[in-house]
Every structure is written in C-alpha cells, then in structure tokens.
Curated annotation (Swiss-Prot), chain A:
Enzyme Commission no: 6.3.5.3, 3.5.1.2
Name the record gives this protein: Phosphoribosylformylglycinamidine synthase subunit PurQ
Keywords, ordered alphabetically: ATP-binding, Cytoplasm, Glutamine amidotransferase, Hydrolase, Ligase, Nucleotide-binding, Purine biosynthesis
Taxonomic classification: Archaea, Methanobacteriati, Methanobacteriota, Methanomada group, Methanococci
GO cellular component: cytoplasm
One GO BP annotation of this record: 'de novo' IMP biosynthetic process
ATP-binding in keyword set: yes
One GO MF term: ATP binding
Glutamine amidotransferase type-1 domain boundaries: 2-230
Superkingdom as given in the UniProt entry: Archaea
Keyword presence, Chloroplast: no
Swiss-Prot record, chain B:
Subunit structure: Homodimer. Part of the FGAM synthase complex composed of 1 PurL, 1 PurQ and 2 PurS subunits.
UniProt xrefs under NCBIfam families: phosphoribosylformylglycinamidine synthase subunit PurS (TIGR00302), PRK05974.1 (NF004630)
Keywords: ATP-binding, Cytoplasm, Ligase, Nucleotide-binding, Purine biosynthesis
Principal EC category: ligase
Any single GO CC term annotated in Swiss-Prot or TrEMBL for this entry: cytoplasm
Pathway(s) this gene product operates in, as recorded in its UniProt entry: Purine metabolism; IMP biosynthesis via de novo pathway; 5-amino-1-(5-phospho-D-ribosyl)imidazole from N(2)-formyl-N(1)-(5-phospho-D-ribosyl)glycinamide: step 1/2
Job description of the protein: Part of the phosphoribosylformylglycinamidine synthase complex involved in the purines biosynthetic pathway. Catalyzes the ATP-dependent conversion of formylglycinamide ribonucleotide (FGAR) and glutamine to yield formylglycinamidine ribonucleotide (FGAM) and glutamate. The FGAM synthase complex is composed of three subunits. PurQ produces an ammonia molecule by converting glutamine to glutamate. PurL transfers the ammonia molecule to FGAR to form FGAM in an ATP-dependent manner.
One GO molecular-function entry: phosphoribosylformylglycinamidine synthase activity
Origin superkingdom: Archaea
InterPro entries for this protein: PurS (IPR003850), PurS-like_sf (IPR036604)
Name recorded for this polypeptide: Phosphoribosylformylglycinamidine synthase subunit PurS
C-alpha cells in the first residue's frame, strides 16, 4: 500500500506525515516535486511546511511544479489525496477544490490546539468519524483564512464540500472558536468527488496520545483502508 | 525591451488584514484622520516582445496562470518600452 508523500523545497512536515501513515498501516514514500508520474501510488499526502518561503502566495509556486500533474490525475481517478496546511494551500492553488486560503484576520502566525467538527464523514479520510464528532488537533499557519464568494460557498455546501469547521470543545461553531477569520469557521474542504480533502489543521501532529491527542490518526487509517479497496 | 508592471490588489469586499493593521498603527501614532489603508503587490517584469500590445497579452496570461489568484485578486498591467 504505497502512499506518496510529496516533498517541495521548504516542505517540513513530511517525516511526521510518513510516521502517521506508517502508524495507520500504510507504506509512505517521499516523492520529490520534479516527479510527474505517480501511477504506482494508491494515494498521496501533501504535507505542510513553507514551500518556496510562501513567496507570491502560500502554495502558489508549488502548485505549478511537475508533480501537480500526477496529483491532479490521482484526484481525477478517485484516489485519496490529502493536503495538510501548506499542502491544503497548494491543493487549492492547483484547483483541487474551490475557494482559497489567505492571510489570517489578525495578521499573525497562529500555532495552537483547536477543536474542529466533522461536517462530512463521507470522505475516505473522515469515514471513521461520526458526523458532528469533535476532534482536538493543532494548527500552525499564517495564511489559513478560508475565503470563497457567496456563490462558490453555496455550491460547496450543495455538493458536500465542507469537511471540517472550527468549533469549541462542545462542538459549538462560534466566532470565538474561529482562530483565523475563516468564512463560516471552515477548516477543511474537499472536491465534488469527496476523494481529495484539504485542511489547515495538522492531523499528523495529533496521531499519538503522547502528542496530546490521537484524534487525527483515523484520517490516515480511513485513507489507507479506502486505498486498499480501489 | 519592455518593462511590464503588474499591480495586484484584493477584490472589493475581501478583507486586507495587513492594511487594517497598518491603519491601526497610523491611528496609534496620532494620524486619526486615516480611515482605510490598502496594500498592493507590485511586480516588474523585464522582457522581450514584439510590441506593447503583445507584451500586455502575455503578461495577462502570466497573471491568470500564476501571478494573481482569481478568487481574491484584481490586477492592472502597465507596459513601457525601455532601452
């Protein structure tokens, strides 16, 4: 069960992601951004970091490198593709879902534990969660404010493309629980086919109890089990 | 040779936290008449081309493919001939 873990210049969460994929029973393999063909992999994770120093816009440069062609093909073929933090920014820049991620409302880098609520448990990554389940997972980003215009947002709700929302400990979606000013507290989205999930929080940093939470591990387990079936 | 200048700004209605933070700092300094601050990104591109129109077309393509994010950005392009 080989899973591609992409590496751009400035990716720094790749080894953490590899560890989480292994914990979930997968076989991670680091793949450099120059590789275009990803046919031998059953799924892919785009880890976080600061690819290309966030030059121009976070994820903008990475989204124009050769590996994007292979990732796009995977998304189109229905293979599970997960973008985390900078990986989510790259995925949205590459057009894998809709909307964009831009500067936090308080104009600061935010690094802290947050709670997110599962809005859609029909994706490979969220299949082992209950709808409405609250997960404790950390965030670490400066450009994580999700934005889409009203028409796009409407389309995304109609097509079940909203996967996670920031909430409080009890699962209430409140303004106080919104760390970065994301529209409707949105923390994670997916494509129409539901096989590509892009989220700002870091599930790999919440994949073992010793880290403070293992709420994120099921995302990788869901991914691996889904990949086995395709 | 031509110099194309691209000015990338946020679309109307998209919040600009950087501009808002600068505005607040100016207010702290006593410039209480400052009501809004917008920040832009400006990119100069030195390039070869047949004529100003062709250069502009090409830079427009660059904006669509990389320089601007159509979800949140508007952009302006100015082209001038240089030595």
């Amino acid at each position: 069960m080989k899973i591609a873990v992409t590496k751009f210049l400035g990716t720094n969460c790749d080894l953490d992601v590899c560890h989480a994929v292994k914990l979930a029973g997968g076989e991670p393999e680091l793949v450099f951004f120059t590789q275009e063909n990803l046919d031998s992999y059953k799924g892919a994770v785009i880890p976080g970091g600061f690819s290309y120093g966030d030059y121009l816009r976070a994820g903008a440069i990475s989204a124009r490198t050769p590996i994007i062609k292979g990732l796009k093909k995977m998304v189109e073929e229905g293979k599970p593709v997960l973008g985390i933090c900078n990986g989510a920014q790259i995925g949205l820049e590459a057009g894998f879902s809709k909307g964009t991620l831009t500067n936090n409302l308080n104009a600061k880098f935010i690094c802290k534990w947050v709670y997110i609520r599962v809005e859609n448990n029909k994706t490979p990554f969220t299949q082992y969660y209950k709808k409405g389940e609250v997960l404790k997972i950390p965030i670490a980003h400066a450009e994580g404010r999700f934005y889409a215009d009203d028409e796009t947002l409407d389309y995304m709700y109609k097509n079940n493309m909203i996967v996670f929302k920031y909430c409080d400990e009890t699962g209430e979606v409140t303004e106080e629980a919104n760390p970065n000013g994301s529209i409707d507290n949105i923390a994670g989205v997916c494509n129409e086919n539901q096989n590509c999930v892009l989220l700002m929080p870091h599930p790999e940093r919440a994949s073992e109890k010793i880290l403070g939470s293992d709420d994120g591990l099921k995302m990788f387990k869901g991914m691996i089990d889904y990949a086995k079936r395709i | 040779m031509y110099k194309a200048t691209v000015i990338i700004k946020l679309k109307k209605g998209v919040l600009n936290p950087e501009g808002r933070t600068i505005q607040r700092a100016l207010n702290f300094l006593g410039f209480n008449n400052v009501k809004e601050v917008q920040t832009y990104k400006m990119i100069d591109i030195i390039m070869e081309g047949e004529n100003e129109e062709k250069v502009k077309e090409e830079v427009e393509e660059m904006c669509k493919k990389l320089l601007a994010n159509p979800v949140i950005h508007d952009y302006e392009i100015k082209v001038e001939k240089i030595e």
